[in-house]
Swiss-Prot record:
The modification N6,N6,N6-trimethyllysine is found at K116, K149. Ca(2+) 3 binds at D94, D96, N98, E105. Ca(2+) 4 binds at D130, D132, D134, Q136, E141. It comes from Euglena gracilis. Ca(2+) 1 binds at D21, D23, D25, T27, E32. Residues 8-43, 44-79, 81-116, 117-149 form the EF-hand domain. One of its GO terms (molecular function) is calcium ion binding. Gene3D superfamilies: EF-hand (1.10.238.10). This is Calmodulin.
Length: 149
């Protein structure tokens, strides 16, 4: 998992890790994990932190070593990239930038992608993703649709 990180990212993570490894023994406590991640621009909730700690801290020692930390951060970085890609895709579909994808916008983009859809097919796609029933797709609905694929 950690192979997906660049040398610069690994160096940055090592520097942050070292700042919180107070006694220099090569481990940080689970309590400090949140502080480290926030210093690197991540914003995990308490529940997310607990989940991450449970995943990484196999022996229940309450500490995380650097290889475990790298694995954790590469997962978080991957999640962030995915979210950014979804935002970018939403912007492509949302031609007028109003925060919603209309049937006309969906049809336009799908046609440009080489997908010749009937009005019924476009309406069906909108209906499937349109949780609140307003006839268009907002960002939250788009994310749900993309994540369910």
């Amino acid at each position: 998992m950690a192979e997906a990180l660049t040398h610069e990212q690994i160096a940055e993570f090592k520097e942050a890790f070292s700042l919180f490894d107070k006694d220099g023994d090569g481990t940080i406590t689970t309590k400090e994990l949140g502080t480290v991640m926030r210093s690197l621009g991540q914003n995990p909730t308490e529940a997310e932190l607990q989940d991450m700690i449970n995943e990484v801290d196999q022996d229940g020692s309450g500490t995380i070593d650097f290889p475990e930390f790298l694995t954790l951060m590469s997962r978080k970085m991957h999640d962030t990239d995915t979210e950014e890609e979804i935002k970018e895709a939403f912007r492509v579909f949302d031609k007028d930038g109003n925060g919603f994808i209309s049937a006309a916008e969906l049809r336009h983009v799908m046609t440009n992608l080489g997908e010749k859809l009937t009005d019924e097919e476009v309406d069906e796609m909108i209906r499937e993703a349109d949780v609140d029933g307003d006839g268009q797709i907002n960002y939250e609905e788009f994310v749900k649709m993309m994540m369910s694929k």
